[in-house]
Amino acid sequence: METNIIELSQSLKISQKQIEKVLELTAEGNTIPFIARYRKEMTGNLDEVEIKAILDLDKSLTNLRERKATVLAKIEEKGKLTEKLRAAIEAAEKLADVEELYLPYKEKRRTKATIAREAGLFPLARLILQNAATLQEEATALTNETFPTAEAALAGAVDILVEAISEDVQLRAWTYHEMLTNSSIVSTLKDQDLDEKQVFQIYYDFSEKIADMQGYRTLALNRGEKLGVLKVSFENNVDKIIRFFEVRFKVKNDYIHEAIQQAVKKKIIPAMERRIRAELTETAEDGAIQLFSDNLRNLLLIAPLKGRVVLGFDPAFRTGAKLAVVDATGKMLTTQVIYPVPPAKAAQIEASKQDLSDLIDQFGVEIIAIGNGTASRESEAFVAEVLKTHPNVSYVIVNESGASVYSASELARHEFPDLTVEKRSAISIARRLQDPLAELVKIDPKSIGVGQYQHDVSQKKLSESLDFVVDTVVNQVGVNINTASPSLLSHVAGLNKTISENIVKYREEEGMIRSRDAIKKVPRLGAKAFEQAAGFLRIPESDNVLDNTGVHPESYPAVEKLFQMLAITDLDQAAQEKLQSLDVKKVAADLDLGEATLKDIIADLLKPGRDMRDSFDAPVLRQDVLDIKDLQIGQKLEGVVRNVVDFGAFVDIGIHEDGLIHISKLSNSYVKHPSQVVSVGDLVTVWVDKLDIEREKVNLSLVAPRESN
């Protein structure tokens, strides 16, 4: 463990003391959100991402150390472990390097070289290396039933040399670094019929130095190859590699030359190509997962539209649009099916206008949330037409990715057992606008669709990363224990699926939970679960104002003492002024609290019941529909960032297809990655840069035309 702590500290640039505390707190059963929020003094104010990085790297280093121990033991069993080899294995920083060092000592399947050694041809292989003048005679003397001629014996000796050369650790390492530096990845078209939409067109004749490969290109090549569209290969300087080997072995005969040719071309280069492809893929996957995670976090933090009556509009052509009205709390008021777009007849469309208008009037609808799937553009035009007679009502295009997944789920069936899948979907679309976080947690994050190549990466790693993001955001925002669904509650630190369901059942049977202390009455919610969860659960109905803040119950006595010190009885303006003027260092010492903890407590007391999402951008409300034909080059528009990818960002500007801001158009200065400039959910001012009306493609710029280079 001590070795891990030193390496963790060096790799993460975090002090050993901080790392020791994180590992100690985790071993005691504390969760990442709890440690980050309520144990700041112990960890030196590390956040959730830093804590997770410590735990992930600790696990990785432990796996590496265990593999080293296994490899060392196996080599020692064979009696071939030297001090030099031991030192090399112990110094290896990657599993791949450990496996390279282990390769010559691994149990092998029966090979040509194995057969040649068993036939006693190893001395002949040594003579070839020594360039002995009597090779033919020596080979003849070693003939046998398996190798009946001198040439056959020499060929067997060459097989031994091929294996020995191909397993030479130093030569393999040199080749690996040579290829990393100078080789290129090449792709060519294999079958255009499998690429009808020409998605992979730029890769039909593609070449890129390995050192310059971008992650999204690696994943695109992998997908194109998997689909049979592309053939992917390497372009290597084979002659340079062979010359290096020949100098190393001081080649003086054709047999050594042949052994090197075979070892390089058939063994070492293919092995290094596999390793490099695997490493490129792993790096690309990690980048894609991180990007998806960042996008998901920003999506979950989009400001909720609280206290609004919303009509969810799930568009469709033939089967009709499904509508659902939900009240300000998200409770379903009614559902309906209308036929607002062709192939519906004109009379049906007119009747649908009246139906929608009646729903708006009857329930006081303030916003219409339109799903962005099939028939979305036509439905948007229909809604905009109806809203001409309802000037106080707006609409928003909502990303409906995953809504169909939710509506067919067991959870949706439990929530709305009497509704069709489509009507459940309309409710989900409406609720996504009211409270994106509460609704999106009901869906597998992978279905939300704010990544790139998410289906081409390790699904286990993706799930772990996205689950961490959801857990982090849910706990940072806090959860109303009296209104939250089991899905939302299950992401609260210390709670699991069973306890979350028990909380909902307890509410249904016993009524509203009116204090944090009452949470302890929930079945299966023990002392540890309470400790971890309590600070993240909000109770607006409680008589104790602290129960609706992020202040943990363990700090209540200190807060009561603080109130006595400041003569505070109510959190009015006078109390807030007193709290703002505190000498934090002195008061923290008086209360036996850490300064970081006291600062958090004061922040909560100044804004009890605050929602951190309120400081983020809210969705753009629209009343008029915009058509791509209305756009002009240089036109200024307002939009919302829908997705961030490696090559740019997609922005909803109110037309059917999102516009693309290429990375080169994000700034006048160099941008390494789009996420440095924009995030999902950001409200942005953009200018139309290029238009392709026929293909319905719009390129945008974040730089005003007069400012661009």
Identify the residue ranges that each predicted region occupies.
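Short beta-alpha connecting loops at secondary-structure transitions
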Residues: 19, 338-343, 367, 408-421, ...
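A glycine-rich phosphate-binding loop feature that marks nucleotide/adenosyl-phosphate handling sites
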Residues: 177-185, 313-317, 373-378, 398-405, ...
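Duplex nucleic acid-engaging cores and interfaces of nucleic-acid transaction enzymes
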Residues: 50-53, 64-74, 78-312, 316-418, ...
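Long, charge-rich intrinsically disordered scaffolds of nucleic-acid metabolism proteins
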Residues: 97, 396, 402, 407-477, ...
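Long, charged amphipathic helices and adjacent flexible linkers at domain junctions
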Residues: 275-293, 447-480, 586-633
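Accessory alpha-helical DNA-binding modules that contact the DNA backbone or grooves
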Residues: 31-32, 43, 47-148, 476-615, ...
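Low-complexity, acidic/Ser/Thr- and charged residue-rich accessory regions of DNA metabolism proteins
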Residues: 138-150, 209, 228, 240, ...
